[in-house]
Structures are given as structure tokens and as C-alpha cells.
Amino acid sequence: MTRGPEADTELRVAASRDALVSASIIEEVAAWGASHGFPSWVPGSFTGLDSVGMSRLRGDIAAGGLHLVWRGDRPVATFSLLERDPIFWPFAGDDALYLHRFAVRRLAAGAGRHAVEWCLREASSRGRSFVRLDCLADNPGIRRYYERYGFTAVDEFVIDGTRYCLCEVRVSA
């Protein structure tokens, strides 16, 4: 449990019961993005206990990597910080942590900043040199968001017609 800059903001490692909470935040962000022309996840991809999205969240929980950001008694953001990313970074070494499934409810200004800054500190405290992530290459808003924290694009590629951007930020020398 980590307190944020706002007195009532708290970051917690998710438990198995939190998969549905995380999924609901991601689905809310996906629906908003789809309705405003900012693609992220496909709406519905985290709906249902047997969905691919839920399977990934359960795997993240098992790895101890899924987190929720709370404001008071309300979950307002979710993300996974993982040791490896064999899909998007298969040849990367052990010098990074990987940020995935980062979603912040629209009403939760500042919660995303708290989460990203915590990820950067956490990677540094574990002796990692980088935090890495993938995002949709065709979403300039999310790319600008990550650039504010020092992330830079290191590669782009296409999977099933979707363009992805790989980004990283150095957290220690």
C-alpha cells in the first residue's frame, strides 16, 4: 500500500477478487475512448469471466503485478507492472519492468500521474534501468501522455492490422 500526493489516494496490489474491478475500469476507459475517437482497448474485451482480457488480468494478479489506485473507497485507476513482456518485448533482457493495462477513470485527475511515478520509482528500487510499455501508435493523445514522463518511442510494428508503438524511459543509470 502506497499513499499518493492527495491524502485520500492509495495504491494497492490487487487480490483475486479485484480482477472484475480492474476490468470495469478498463471497460469504462475503452468505451469513453471509442466514443471520442481515442482508441485503446476494444470495448467488451474485458467483459466476461472467460474473456482474453480477464485471463490476462488473472495472470497479472498471479504474478503480483496488478495494482489498483483508490481514492477513498473508490477504485479510480488500474495497471499492471510486470517482470517480463514476451509478446511485445520478447528479446529484451532483465533490465526493465513492463507497464500494461493502464487505465484511469475520467473523474480521477492526478491518479494516473501517481501511478506512473510510482512505477518509475518501483523499477528503480528493484535495480531496473527502464520501464517499458506498448501503446497504440495511432493514438497521439496516449503517446503524448507517456512522453510527459520521459517515455520515448523505440519501435513501431503492426499486428493483425493494428499499429503498436514500443516506448521506454530510463529510470536509473
Question: Where are the regions that the model predicts?
Answer:
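Conserved N-terminal entry element of GNAT/NAT acetyltransferase domains
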Residues: 1-20, 24, 173
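Conserved GNAT-fold acetyl-CoA-binding loop/helix
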Residues: 27-56
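Conserved acetyl-CoA-binding loop-helix of GNAT-fold acetyltransferases
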Residues: 109-121, 144-148
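A short helix-loop-beta-strand connector motif used in the catalytic cores of GNAT acetyltransferases and
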Residues: 51-68, 98
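Conserved beta-strand in the GNAT
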Residues: 68, 74-83, 98, 103
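Conserved acetyl-CoA binding element of GNAT-fold acetyltransferases
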Residues: 90-106
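Conserved GNAT acetyl-CoA-binding A-motif
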Residues: 123-135
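Conserved beta-strand-loop-alpha-helix junction that forms the acyl-donor binding cleft
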Residues: 107, 133-143, 159-163
